[in-house]
UniProtKB/Swiss-Prot annotation:
Residues 1-33, 90-119 are extracellular. It is found in: Membrane. This is Putative uncharacterized membrane protein YBR113W. Partially overlaps CYC8. The chain crosses the membrane at residues 34-54, 69-89, 120-140. Keywords: Membrane, Transmembrane, Transmembrane helix. Its main location: membrane. It comes from Saccharomyces cerevisiae (strain ATCC 204508 / S288c) (Baker's yeast).
Amino acid sequence: MPLRPCRHHQGFLPKKQWRAKFPQLIVLMGRVAAEELLPAVAVAAVVVAVVVAVERVVPLLFVHRPDSFFLIFFFQSCFVCCCCCCSCSTSLKAYSSEKEKQKYGKRGNGNTPLVQRLVTLSYLALLILVLSIELLTWFVKKQRTGNKKQKDKEKNALLL
């Protein structure tokens, strides 16, 4: 019996089927990037925002205790990431359904207002996320320098 692709040799599906869908999703995102500029820019913006968040926020998790400001920022960034993922998935679904309509000869209506609104909301959410990351890093730097100056004053007072 010949082996079938994406199946175990005993005929069972793999335990994690989502891994088998990654290449299809990557190909679809490549097609979107080649033919449609708006979803490609949204995907690129999501990737940039995630990289910036990981680069700036993860070291702060290990250095500082989470306070109320950090928790507000954390929940805000989670909301922003959910908005971005929803808008990207909706735009990818709209793109794939439009391609299916063109394939079967039906008339497609292009980007719906819902998709355009979601992409615009994702751009605004990404802007808020980047600004809040910058605000958080500025706040932590100011707190560090303030603590350092206070410790220096205490040392000078003890020496005198």
